[in-house]
């Protein structure tokens, strides 16, 4: 029996589980369900064929634990001025606070602290 089932182990699912475990007032038994493969079993046929073969039932690059970010170069936009409409919805200061909070979590789990592209 689980207190909560999270569908999707991309960044949103992973961060949701982490926040619930860290900030929950009671212990949570959480099931994180993902239709893709674990990171260590995600291999793209394009590496051998040179072309996308439209994997079925799911793409090994975009689906699986950590989502497409598992194979990204790790770039994050660390300014509310880059991206969508979040600052319009919650304000610039709060948007930046959330971005900084998220960056600290990534750093806690081993992200490279070097920041590039700052102007």
Regions flagged by a language model, labelled:
Residues 1-12, 31-33:
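Beta1/beta-strand and adjacent pyrophosphate-binding region of the FAD-binding site
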Residues 16-17, 42:
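Short glycine-/acidic-enriched loop or helix-start segments at secondary-structure transitions
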Residues 8, 24, 61-62:
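A generic structural signal for short, solvent-exposed coil/turn residues
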Residues 35-119:
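Conserved N-terminal/central alpha/beta ligand/cofactor-binding core
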Residues 6-8, 16, 74:
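Conserved structural-core and active-site-/substrate-pathway-adjacent residues in large, well-folded domains
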Residues 17, 21-24:
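Gly/Ala-rich phosphate-binding loop of Rossmann-like dinucleotide-binding domains
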Residues 25-30:
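A generic structural motif
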Residues 13-14, 64:
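Hydrophobic alpha-helical segments
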């Amino acid at each position: 029996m689980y207190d909560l089932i999270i569908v999707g182990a991309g960044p949103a699912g992973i961060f949701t589980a982490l926040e619930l475990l860290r900030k929950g007032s009671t212990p949570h038994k959480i099931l994180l369900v993902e239709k893709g493969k674990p990171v260590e079993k995600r291999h793209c046929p394009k590496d051998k064929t040179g072309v996308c073969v439209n994997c079925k039932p799911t793409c090994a690059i975009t689906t699986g634990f950590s989502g497409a970010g598992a194979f990204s170069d790790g770039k994050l936009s660390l300014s509310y001025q880059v991206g969508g409409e979040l600052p319009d919805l919650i304000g610039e200061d709060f948007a930046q606070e959330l971005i900084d909070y998220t960056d600290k979590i990534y750093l806690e789990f081993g992200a490279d602290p070097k920041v590039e592209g700052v102007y």
